Curated annotation (Swiss-Prot):
The keyword Cytoplasm applies. InterPro entries: DCTN6, Trimer_LpxA-like_sf. Its main location: cytoplasm. Keywords: Centromere, Chromosome, Cytoplasm, Cytoskeleton, Kinetochore, Phosphoprotein. This is Dynactin subunit 6. It is found in: Cytoplasm, Cytoskeleton; Chromosome, Centromere, Kinetochore. The modification Phosphothreonine is found at residue 186. Subunit of dynactin, a multiprotein complex part of a tripartite complex with dynein and a adapter, such as BICDL1, BICD2 or HOOK3. The dynactin complex is built around ACTR1A/ACTB filament and consists of an actin-related filament composed of a shoulder domain, a pointed end and a barbed end. Its length is defined by its flexible shoulder domain. The soulder is composed of 2 DCTN1 subunits, 4 DCTN2 and 2 DCTN3. The 4 DCNT2 (via N-terminus) bind the ACTR1A filament and act as molecular rulers to determine the length. The pointed end is important for binding dynein-dynactin cargo adapters. Phosphorylation at Thr-186 by CDK1 during mitotic prometaphase creates a binding site for PLK1 that facilitates its recruitment to kinetochores. It comes from Sus scrofa (Pig). The gene is DCTN6.
Amino acid sequence: MAEKTQKSVKIAPGAVVCVESEIRGDVTIGPRTVIHPKARIIAEAGPIVIGEGNLIEEQALIINAHPDNITPDAEDSEPKPMIIGTNNVFEVGCYSQAMKMGDNNVIESKAYVGRNVILTSGCIIGACCNLNTFEVIPENTVIYGADCLRRVQTERPQPQTLQLDFLMKILPNYHHLKKTMKGSSTPVKN
């Protein structure tokens, strides 16, 4: 099974993916994305496409799972891809099933985002917030506190460029990395 799993994981050049992370199913990881040890990305109901410059921290779980009311062997249930945009941050211990996510979003520690939520861009889901509604979260929305209160911020969260650069230098010193795919369309410089 591990043999089959490895073949369907595509890691773009420039991404840093620690061997201790768990990646199962058809997963595509974009360039400049950093995946910490113990992060889990599981594509069982369809592929997961992760864009450029995302940060996925320890114990974060990104899962494209079958909805509770649909059995995996139902013939009419075709795979639905989970699309994650660019410059998103998945903090320690968060759980995301959101099928569509834009750019510059932050899912903070221990937050839960359900399958029927669509995050646009610039959203922050606060620590321990549980979001499991059928809705599209408007741009630049902040969801915070025990009651999951909402407000709109004036600007998007800044991309974690400096943190990504730092992690790209430091993580290879302390962890083994998964091999990246050599891009057929773009030349790779080592």
